[in-house]
Amino acid sequence: MTTTTTKAIILVGGPSKGTRFRPLSLDVPKLLFPIAGKPMIYHHIEACSKVENMKEIILIGFFQESVLSKFISETSKQLNVAIRYINEEKVLGTAGGLYHFRDIILEGGPSEIFVLHSDICCAFPLNDLLQFHKQHGRSCTIMGTEIESAYANQYGCLVRDEKTAELLHYAEKPETFVSNLINCGVYCFSPQFFDVIGKTMIDLKTSGQNITTDYPEITRKGFDVERLRLEQDIFVPLAGTGFISVYPYVGFWRQIKNAGSSVYCQELYLNHFAKTKPEVLKKGNNIIGNVIIDSTASVDPSAIIGPDVYIGPNVKIGKGVRVIHSIILDQTEIKDHACIIYSIIGWQSLIGVWARIEGIPNYTPFLYSQDKRRGVTIFGAGAQANGEIIVSNCIVMPHKQLDRNYNNEIIL
């Protein structure tokens, strides 16, 4: 009996796609930024590695290979799964890149291929998605989830036949309300879906902007067939044609749009870990809620940590410190009685005695309200806050030294 295999593709983008993640992406690529103690895409790869007969995980992007080589080597050994990186020489778009590298992806004859965007946080129920995809027999399945209607137009909106699960309509960030069922950025393809992408590309090349009568019309002005987008240029025209199913995912999900999103995504992952792998969470009399503390970090017993905190390698936490809903990165020192709330403190930073660093909790997808930024306070690498100052709702560039109070500022 022939054993079927699967592959997974993770679309990782490149340096120019991480600008909203600054200042943190100045020191580490966005996809390697630690969320809940692991690089962002580690969570994707770990989920893929748990799929039975996963033959290979392929990362596609336009980073230099050297940027990811150490991470790939270490993660491949740790999870015992083959991982490969493919560098796009030019930006091809999500569908264009998949089709360009189709021979590599389809090598070895996988029966199904997962495709995941790197900038999302969820439980990645890939085995359930795979079973659903096989049951419904279409060449593509989109994982969708329901969110609050007020935020739905920030994402790709799906209209699904409740009886057959077929995708009937797809609208990317529509101006008016279409549906509160949105695209999660996780897909399962059958190999023949690459033929569908190829057919669509041929039709687009032939007609410039319009699909042939086999598919609905595309009306993207100035269309460039070399940069084919999976969502807008493939899913939109194929909706209602019988090619695509929608898997209804019930669970946590969030897009990692900017650096501050990491704090909210960390909270979701830590809540998930409390149920699925509680052994990674720190316990103790000074710990509140879900917390991960690296084994090399030094935390004074009088410091109160949590909930929803990550403390990285070689961090020093002084007496009476309070850390809540925050990420404290490697080799940072938090002096006695400092308070850190809804903040990310970058690598090798220093927070002085009795300093207070705080962000504004904002769980919506809108970073700005009434023209004011409302979000997590972020310190770039090597930044310093002197003792007894308050820094609230700010972004601090790397290696800045703060000697007074700041509020609602980007500190260059």
UniProtKB/Swiss-Prot annotation:
Residues 281-412 are annotated as: Hexapeptide repeat domain. PANTHER family: SUGAR-1-PHOSPHATE GUANYL TRANSFERASE (PTHR22572). Gene3D superfamilies: Hexapeptide repeat proteins, Spore Coat Polysaccharide Biosynthesis Protein SpsA, Chain A. GO terms for cellular component: cytoplasm. InterPro entries: GMPPB_C, Hexapep_transf_CS, Mannose-1P_guanyltransferase, NTP_transferase_dom, Nucleotide-diphossugar_trans. GO terms for molecular function: mannose-1-phosphate guanylyltransferase (GTP) activity. GDP-alpha-D-mannose binds at E88, Q255. It holds the Pfam family NTP_transferase. The N-terminal substrate-binding domain adopts a Rossman-like fold and has a binding pocket for GTP or GDP-alpha-D-mannose. The C-terminal domain consists of a series of tandem hexapeptide repeats that adopt a beta-helix conformation. The beta-helix forms several protein interaction surfaces involved in assembly of the GMPPA-GMPPB mannose-1-phosphate guanylyltransferase complex. Vertebrate orthologs possess a loop extending from the C-terminal domain (C-loop) involved in interaction with other subunits of the GMPPA-GMPPB complex and involved in allosteric inhibition of gmppB that appears to be absent in Dictyostelium. This is Mannose-1-phosphate guanylyltransferase regulatory subunit alpha. Component of the GMPPA-GMPPB mannose-1-phosphate guanylyltransferase complex composed of 4 gmppA subunits and 8 gmppB subunits; the complex is organized into three layers, a central layer made up of 2 gmppA dimers sandwiched between two layers each made up of 2 gmppB dimers. It comes from Dictyostelium discoideum (Social amoeba). One of its GO terms (biological process) is GDP-mannose biosynthetic process.
